Regions:
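Short acidic, glycine/serine/threonine-rich loops at helix termini
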Residues: 75-76, 131-135
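Basic phosphate/pyrophosphate-binding loop/patch that engages nucleotide-derived ligands
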Residues: 140-145
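Acidic/His- and Gly-rich active-site-bordering loop/insert found
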Residues: 1-90, 99, 106-116
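Divalent metal-coordination and catalytic microenvironments
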Residues: 14, 64, 94, 121, ...
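Glycine-/small-residue-rich active-site loops that bind phosphorylated ligands and cofactors
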Residues: 20, 128-129
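Conserved small/polar residues in nucleotide/adenosyl-binding loops
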Residues: 149-151
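Beta-strand segments within the central parallel beta-sheet cores of soluble alpha/beta enzyme folds
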Residues: 116-124
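Short glycine/serine/threonine-rich phosphate/pyrophosphate-binding segments
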Residues: 97-101, 130-133
Length: 151
């Protein structure tokens, strides 16, 4: 399967399992399963968050972050891949963000580059509320990182 079709598949599958912040258990399992298939050893954080760390033996780390949670909104679309969780949906693109970060993870595995940084992929729970970014910072996960790009 080519990269674009795989990202599309991930997005559609993730779109069907929207979960509120810090309740992203199915989403977390889905992400860990996909990352494991790629050859990674995903790390669980904050119960539902997921990390992948690529150690390039550098002093600094470059992090890429995606949000995971959905909103309490009933989906009213005619898509073939609508939410399976009545009353919840990915209404602001977090399904696409996760799919894009999975795409980056796959590309990094298929075509390893000589990075001048270690790489950290963060699938962050609770972006909408109750403040998953704050919880990640408070847990000390970002202390050593050079910069952060939010997908």
């Amino acid at each position: 399967m080519d990269a674009l079709n795989e990202i599309k598949r991930w997005r559609q599958e993730l779109h069907q399992i929207p979960e509120l912040g810090l309740q992203e258990f199915k989403t977390s399992k889905y992400l860990k399963d996909e990352l494991t298939k790629m050859g990674y050893e995903p790390i669980s954080i904050l119960d539902t968050g997921v990390l992948v760390y690529l150690d390039n033996h550098q002093d600094k780390t470059l992090a890429f972050r995606s949000d995971m949670d959905a909103l309490k909104i009933s989906e009213q679309t005619n898509c073939s891949f609508t939410s399976c969780h009545n009353g919840y949906m990915h209404a602001c693109g977090h399904d696409g963000h996760m799919a894009a970060l999975l795409g980056l993870a796959k590309k990094l595995k298929e075509q390893p580059l000589k990075w001048k940084h270690n790489i950290l992929l963060i699938f962050q729970p609770a972006e909408e509320s109750p403040g998953g970014a704050k919880l990640i910072v408070e847990a000390g996960i970002l202390k050593q990182y050079l910069s952060l790009i939010h997908i």
